[in-house]
């Protein structure tokens, strides 16, 4: 991952060569394990207005299946750091439908992100990409993918939970 100074340099180069609206949303996506508090301050000072963090889940066993290196707490800390740095928009991405994720795991993940200073939450159904360790484990029968009813339940839970807290579905 490029350090903030290089990202800001790229943004400056783009602005020098192309018209960029003053109110343009400039987004950086990041994984929680790859950022520190000063990272967000540097990006905000350089003109980035939105940070999207790949939180995925508050369940350690789900993060392990997804081969994620951050702890649930680290993901929540990263959202707080971005907000404290004054980043205008902070978003967390969740993934549902991971093998071994229960409905209670999913509800706890939603509860966790609802208590953070974010203004957007994305909830995506897991897509297992060929060539990944997860795809191999599923193909070998080591992990079972959830059925369509489980996925539908998790979608509905997220939709109702997030809407009740002012997050609006737009996709």
Language model region names:
Residues 1-171:
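C-terminal scaffold of the Radical SAM
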């Amino acid at each position: 991952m490029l350090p903030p100074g290089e990202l800001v340099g790229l943004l400056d180069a783009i602005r020098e060569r192309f018209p960029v609206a003053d109110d343009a949303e400039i987004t950086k996506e990041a994984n929680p394990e790859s950022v520190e508090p000063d990272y967000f301050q540097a990006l905000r000072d350089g003109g980035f207005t939105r940070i999207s963090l790949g939180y995925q889940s508050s369940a350690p066993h789900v993060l392990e299946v997804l081969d994620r290196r951050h702890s649930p707490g680290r993901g929540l800390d990263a959202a707080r750091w971005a907000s404290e740095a004054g980043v205008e928009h902070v978003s967390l991405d969740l993934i549902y439908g991971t093998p071994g994720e229960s409905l209670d795991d999913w509800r706890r993940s939603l509860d966790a992100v609802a208590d953070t200073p974010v203004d957007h939450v994305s909830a995506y159904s897991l897509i297992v990409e060929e060539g990944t360790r997860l795809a191999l484990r599923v193909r070998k029968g080591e992990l079972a993918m959830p059925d369509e009813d489980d996925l539908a339940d998790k979608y509905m839970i997220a939709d109702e939970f997030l809407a009740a807290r002012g997050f609006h579905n737009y996709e």
